[in-house]
Each structure stands twice: as C-alpha cells, then as structure tokens.
Curated annotation (Swiss-Prot):
Protein name per Swiss-Prot or TrEMBL: Ribosomal protein L11 methyltransferase
Transferase among keywords: yes
Gene this protein is translated from: prmA
Assigned keywords, A-Z: Cytoplasm, Methyltransferase, S-adenosyl-L-methionine, Transferase
GO biological process: methylation
Species of origin: Colwellia psychrerythraea (strain 34H / ATCC BAA-681)
SUPFAM superfamilies according to UniProt: S-adenosyl-L-methionine-dependent methyltransferases (SSF53335)
C-alpha cells in the first residue's frame, strides 16, 4: 500500500502538540526526528521529555487520505498559519522492514570488537561479537558517541574488571564490556524501557548473569574499575558528583555524548577528581578520559 508522509517543522515547545494534531487528523504513525543532527533528546525523571530544539514531526497517512483537508485543518488551528512549514511526500510501496534491515551492517570497533545485527552473518567468528538489533533504546553503535566508547572499551584490559555503564540505553556498552572479559557490569538508566532492552540484549548474548540493572533511585553504592557514561553534557555536568563516586581508586573514566565546544568545561569539572587525558574526537563529538587520582 502506498503512503503519504507529512513533515512539519517544529521545536521543543510545540513538537508534542503537533504530534497530537497529526494523530487527530488520522495519521497511522507519528515520528520525531532531529532536524539538525543534535543529540537524541534526553528523558528526565518522570514523564517529562525534552525534545530537540529543531524537530521534524512526521505523520504517515494512507495514500487515499484527503491531505488537502488535513492541511486546511492544521492551518486553521495553527497560531500563525503563514509560518507553518510543511512538506508532503509520496512514499513508494515497498517492503519497509526489509529496507530498514538492509541499512544495518556489522560494525568493527578497535581491534577485537564487532557489533552485528542478528540477521547478518558474523564477519569474524573468532572476534568479540556483540549481537544487537536496533530497537527499544538509543545506542546501537551507529552514533559517534557510542562508537567512541566502544573503541575505548576495546582498547582496555577488562579481564575480571568491574564496570559501571551510567545511562546504559540499549546496553551496548555493558554487553561490550562483558564480552571483553569484565566479570560484572552495573547498568543504570532513568528509563525502564532501556533497562528492559538491556536485559533482553544481555540474554541474547548469554551474559545476563553478570549484568545488574538499576533505576537511579535503586542504584547501589559501588566502586568500579571502569566507569563509562555516554549521556549528554548537561547531565554529565549536573551529575558529576554522582558519577565520580562510582570510580574506584585509580579507576578509569570515560565520558561521551559531548560536543567539542562543551568538552573544556567537563574537563575542568572532572579534573577535580581525575587526571584527564586529551579528548578523542569523531566528527563533532568527543570522548573524555581520565583516571581517578
């Protein structure tokens, strides 16, 4: 069945309202995407969500839907119909699931580590292979911040080490650490769905017996040999006293989800507790590394 996609330009103040409007008009699905390649929105405790400052809200309609009527309705309720920016696109009829799956390939990080979708053949059976499908939560290796952290983990000797994955998302960093030899990983995330995804992915990779998962309110007191936090600069700044408490004596720390212009502030903050190294850069994103003093 062919489809019509309606794209609306929005911002963090009106994105959710636009979503409601599209649903009211009969959209079969509503999707938010980032309009300017900024980080994925950061969920907050509770139900509050911060959207990107430049967001595209996309509604998917059956081709037979009266789109003139939809546009007229949206313009009638828009506070400034002259400023309502939209685009209509006809999507060809194809196997969208197959199209989506074809976009994901095994990816190598560092010298040993591969992340492989379950429907692809493993390129190197002797390598460290994490089987992970794009799904419930952010973090499947395709974003530079995740790639930076995976490459860092690959370069460490994690044999019998303990690791904290702060903001674990899909669990990709936890799984990588466990597959690379860590004896125990504690994953922490504010999103229960992320914890569900991490557990499911750990079970698929046969490492769930060494993974503990917690919401922040339940997180234990714990000192780790290695701490990795791939979130965003704001939470990394605000939660610095919490994150640093997980880093044991001479423990290693990696921070990502940070743009180049945000790095110096975080270097200064975490430099109170750690000997910080020069940042690693991929595209416009950085990873900060340090060792507890």
């Amino acid at each position: 069945m062919p489809w019509i996609q309606l794209r609306l330009s929005a911002n963090e103040d009106n994105a959710e309202k636009y979503s409601d409007w599209l649903s009211a008009c009969g959209s079969q699905a509503v999707t938010f995407i980032d309009a300017k390649d900024t980080p994925i929105y950061e969920p907050l405790p509770g139900d509050e969500v911060i959207y990107w400052s430049n967001t595209v809200v996309m509604g998917l309609f059956e081709a037979s839907h009266d789109m003139d009527k939809v546009i007229s309705y949206l313009q009638s309720i828009h506070p400034d119909k002259e400023q309502m920016r939209y685009k209509l696109e006809q999507l060809e009829d194809k196997d969208w699931e197959r199209e989506w799956m074809d976009n994901f390939h095994p990816m190598k990080f560092g010298e040993r580590l591969w992340v492989c979708p379950s429907w692809r053949d493993v390129p190197d059976p002797e390598a460290v292979n994490v089987m992970l499908d794009p799904g419930l939560a952010f973090g499947t290796g395709t974003h530079p911040t995740t790639a930076l952290c995976l490459t860092w983990l690959d370069g460490l000797d994690l044999q019998d080490k303990t690791v904290v994955d702060f903001g674990c998302g899909s669990g990709i960093l936890s799984l990588a650490a466990l597959k690379l030899g860590a004896k125990k990983v504690i994953g922490i995330d504010i999103d229960p769905q992320a914890l569900q995804a991490s557990l499911a992915n750990a079970e698929r990779n046969n490492v769930s017996d060494r993974l503990e998962l917690y919401l922040p309110k339940d997180q234990p007191e714990f000192k780790a040999d290695v701490v990795v936090a791939n979130i965003l600069a704001g939470p990394l700044r605000e939660l610095a006293p919490v994150i640093i408490e997980y880093v044991g004596d001479k423990g290693l720390l990696a921070l990502s989800g940070v743009l180049e212009e945000q790095a110096q502030t975080l270097q200064t903050i975490y430099g109170q507790w750690c000997d910080m190294e020069p940042v690693s850069v991929q595209e416009e994103w950085v990873r900060l590394n340090g060792q507890r003093k």
